[in-house]
Structure formats: C-alpha cells, structure tokens
Amino acid sequence: VTHVLTWRNGLSESEAAEIALLLTETAEADGAHPVSEDVRLRLRQSGPAEIQIEPVQGDVMGSEHFVVRDGAGLLLGYAHLDGGAEPPVAELAVHPAHRRAGVGTRLVTALTERAPHLKVWSHSQDPAAEVLARKFGFTVTRELWQMRAPLHDDFPEPRWPQGIQVRTFVPGQDEGAVVEVNAKAFAWHPEQGRMSVADVRAREAEAWFDPAGFFLAVDENDRLAGFHWTKIVDGLGEVYVVGVDPESQGGGLGKALTLAGLRHLRGRELAEVMLYVERDNEAAVHVYQKLGFTRASSDVQYTL
C-alpha cells in the first residue's frame, strides 16, 4: 500500500473535518480519545487573519499536522505536534480499519525527523503503541490515571476555611483571576500551567460549558483563592480542574472545593464522575481514593 505523508501548519476546513471524523471513529473503536481535548479544540480554531494567506484551521500556538493517506487519497492516520511545548509533544491516531500496516511507523518516523527530542502520548493502552515506542527507543516518563467514582448522596457538606465564600464563575469577568491562580497552582504542570484567557474562552464556547458548575472560592475582597471547574459530557461528570492558590493551600480549601463540585454533579442526577491525576502525585491520589475514586485507565507519555 502506498502511504503519502504530508506535513503542514494549517488545515483546510474540509481536511480538518475529515481528521475530526477519523478521531471520532478511533475514539469509538478504542473507548478513549486518541488525542487530548486541547488538540481537538485547536483543530476547530483559526489563527489570526492578518498572518494567513488563506483561511486555514488548526494554525494556532505552534500546532503542526501530519497526515497519511493511501494512493487514492483515503485518510489513514493523523498526528498532531505541539511545537510550542519544550520538548515538543505529539499525539497520533491510526484509523481502526488500517492498523498493523505501517501507518503508525510512518507517522512516528516523520515526527522524530521533525523533532529529535520528543514526547508522545498514548491514550488507549493499545499494546501496539508500546511496541512502536520500544522500536523507536522511547521510554515511559509519565503516567496519567483516569479515576472514577460513583456519585452518591453522602458526600459531606464542604467545610470552608475562615473568611472564604463560594460563588460561581461570571463569564467576561473572572477569566483573568482564574488564569492567574491556575498558573500559580500548576506552575509544576507541563500542560495545565500554560492555560491562558484565550484557552478559558475557547472552553466557554463549548456546548458542555456551564458557569453554574464552575465554583470560585473568594475572600472578603472577592479575591480568588481557588476554584473547581466541573464538566458534564454524555452523562458523565468530571472534576475538570481544581486549582488552589499556593498561599491558600493547607487549610482544607482543595477538599472543600472538590466536595462542592461533587455535590453539584450529584444534584444533576449523574451516576458517575471521573478525573485525571498524575500517578506519582501520591497525595492527590490518596485524597481521591478516600472519596471513593478508583483507577479506571491510564494515559502514558513516552519520551525520546
């Protein structure tokens, strides 16, 4: 089979739609999205008009797109490279009907030629990903656990530290404060710490966004101390982000915010909630285990 690989910064509208379909079909077959939410959002965005010769999508924040087609032009596989990260981070998908045919190898070869030092995510625990990683000399450097818990009626009432009140997010007003606290809370985190006001606004435009599920813990002067952003997609609740200003840590604020969000999701008649946590963040894993969360799956990051 002839494999034709193309590499570019932006995508036409029709190609972006084709890639979105490939990603959806891959997710349905594997039971896990092959690329992160961030990549899926980037595919729908356009770069600033003044730097584009023609309108393209996905030409944002250092995104690069690798596309493999057969001789007849059928889309077989796709990889996204985030060149804005240091080192660059890649995610890829091979269509379920075209696996074990060298498409993944072709994509990883192109990625390693483009970025000799590289991180690659595998989101689906596919043994083929491990084989491919070994073949190219990658090592596992990070593991992200997806943990799940049943939503029940006996989550205790949150106990707020003295001087703290809780309110919900106001679009158009609170983005800057959330981004500031998030950057401090996740200074150590390679993805979450980079969240910008534009990233928050992109999520506000998504169908799942609901300010009633976005809790802000503020002091007497309405200064933000921490937040819990929840998410509901396809009937599954998510502890999307819990961020606490380091100056406000240690007083039980993180736990109170987590409980406020869990009680909100329970009130929406949902049966289950999920979250992502770094496997080596033992303190957080322990907190979530005490709340009834157990590991459901893992995302693995390989480094070359």
What are these regions (language model features)?
Residues 188-236, 246:
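Phosphate-binding active sites in nucleotide-utilizing proteins
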Residues 1-53, 159-193:
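Short amphipathic alpha-helix that is part of the acyltransferase structural core
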Residues 72-77, 141, 211, 222-226, ...:
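Glycine-rich acetyl-CoA-binding "A-motif" of GNAT/NAT acetyltransferases
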Residues 135-155, 259-263, 268-304:
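Active-site/acyl-donor-binding loops of N-acyltransferases
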Residues 100-114, 135, 244-246, 250-267, ...:
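Conserved acetyl-CoA-binding loop-helix of GNAT-fold acetyltransferases
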Residues 8-13, 23-115, 119, 225-237:
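Conserved donor-binding loop and adjoining core beta-sheet/short helix segment
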